[in-house]
């Protein structure tokens, strides 16, 4: 069967990665969490002091650091999930902290960083058969993706979902801190100059505020056949 690229973009904490992962499993495609690359770079820049706690970045040092930075994903059979490795270390847990979430949008605004990540993503998608979730996959990284989905959902519902995910590892997280982080990230992601978050004209809109994962998958299965035939040029 023809292999395609499925691009899933949308606002923070709309459940893009759970949805994308489930699609990848069902289709036996590779799932790529593109936000993890921006988060890993943010961690590296913070660790080296190139990114300060008030989000200032030494651009020259950043360019040099990028040349020394190697990021890859490795599938962990035990938990059946792919994990992020930064210069050989498993950083999957560290990159999910609220600290990194608070800083990552400032790093993702920088054109050189976006070019670095785009190159990795285009290599990973060369053979197609991938599901990628992010902010600019359908608009900038793979504008020729056969199937594009843009996800949104109610801000409060997103914040509650995100808090539930964070609490086991960060018991001091509050609904207020999560809400303000989501609003701030949405604002920066949507207003940056390079590849801002927006719905591609040919993307399907999925508002999952009141949908379970099974309902989202039902919707997905209903639209998928339209994008798998050979003469599809959506
Ligand atoms: O999906 P996420 O929350 O892990 O993404 C983290 C940040 O990375 C998000 O605030 C914006 C940025 N990002 C981006 O600019 N472009 C992408 N394709 C993916 C993520």
Show which residues each predicted segment covers.
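N-terminal phosphate/diphosphate-binding loop that engages ATP/GTP or pyrophosphate donors
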Residues: 26-95
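ATP-binding Walker
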Residues: 14
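Walker A/P-loop
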Residues: 17
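Small-molecule kinase domains that catalyze NTP-dependent phosphoryl transfer to phosphate-bearing small molecules
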Residues: 65, 75-76, 121-127, 135-140, ...
